[in-house]
Curated annotation (Swiss-Prot):
Protein name: Killer cell lectin-like receptor subfamily F member 1
Organism: Homo sapiens
One Gene Ontology cellular component: plasma membrane
Name of the coding gene: KLRF1
Quaternary data: Homodimer. Interacts with CLEC2B.
Glycosylation sites: N77, N91, N96, N176
Topology within the bilayer: Single-pass type II membrane protein
Length: 231
């Protein structure tokens, strides 16, 4: 009888030790798992932080690159007296017109919706005048409306312009002969591509460009024609 009681007592004690050891192992496993979870969580947070900083840096670099390109490129702070040679812009006031507005219009979002009465083509907006002005007055008119006289980049754009012109007379574009550079220059400061366009007429001081039937002609800048604004 005593042996039986001793056996039962030993059996109970053995079970208690086994249960305690199991509890200790389970708690230890949980502690290890929690430790690794904290490590992984820390690594994840660090990686996310690095990615966020990298993205912010890229955005800042792109923004600075666009700004520097705009500042150092054709959109300089030179006055329009330099770009238009000896032309007097807006006679009487002899106002100096900065090219900052041209720079702003070129860096604008290409997906912007065109204003009322403006036509959209290839991410740009076009306005066709019904009045007639000299080249310099036409230039000022466009600039005051946060745009510039038409700059034509290729024959497809020329075809679009001709399709929407409802008359066959001359129309001013943003191209003139500058005495300082002694060349035909667009209002954004870039030279004309002679491989794409040929200008009929003299290349001399006080000469501005007008289009008629898909051709570009040299005309006296004081002549009065209709014009096209673009942004």
């Amino acid at each position: 009888m005593q042996d039986e009681e001793r056996y039962m007592t030993l059996n109970v004690q053995s079970k208690k030790r086994s249960s305690a050891q199991t509890s200790q192992l389970t708690f230890k496993d949980y502690s290890v798992t929690l430790h690794w979870y904290k490590i992984l969580l820390g690594i994840s947070g660090t990686v996310n932080g690095i990615l966020t900083l990298t993205l912010i840096s890229l955005i800042l670099l792109v923004s600075q690159g666009v700004l520097l390109k705009c500042q150092k490129g054709s959109c300089s702070n030179a006055t329009q007296y330099e770009d238009t040679g000896d032309l007097k812009v807006n006679n009487g006031t002899r106002r100096n017109i900065s090219n900052k507005d041209l720079c702003a219009s070129r860096s604008a979002d290409q997906t912007v919706l065109c204003q009322s009465e403006w036509l959209k083509y290839q991410g740009k907006c076009y306005w066709f005048s019904n009045e007639m002005k000299s080249w310099s007055d036409s230039y000022v008119y466009c600039l005051e409306r946060k745009s510039h006289l038409l700059i034509i980049h290729d024959q497809l754009e020329m075809a679009f312009i001709q399709k929407n012109l409802r008359q066959l007379n001359y129309v001013w574009i943003g191209l003139n002969f500058t005495s300082l550079k002694m060349t035909w220059t667009w209002v954004d400061g870039s030279p004309i591509d002679s491989k794409i366009f040929f200008i009929k007429g003299p290349a001399k001081e006080n000469s501005c460009a007008a289009i008629k039937e898909s051709k570009i002609f040299s005309e006296t800048c004081s002549s009065v024609f209709k014009w096209i604004c673009q942004y």
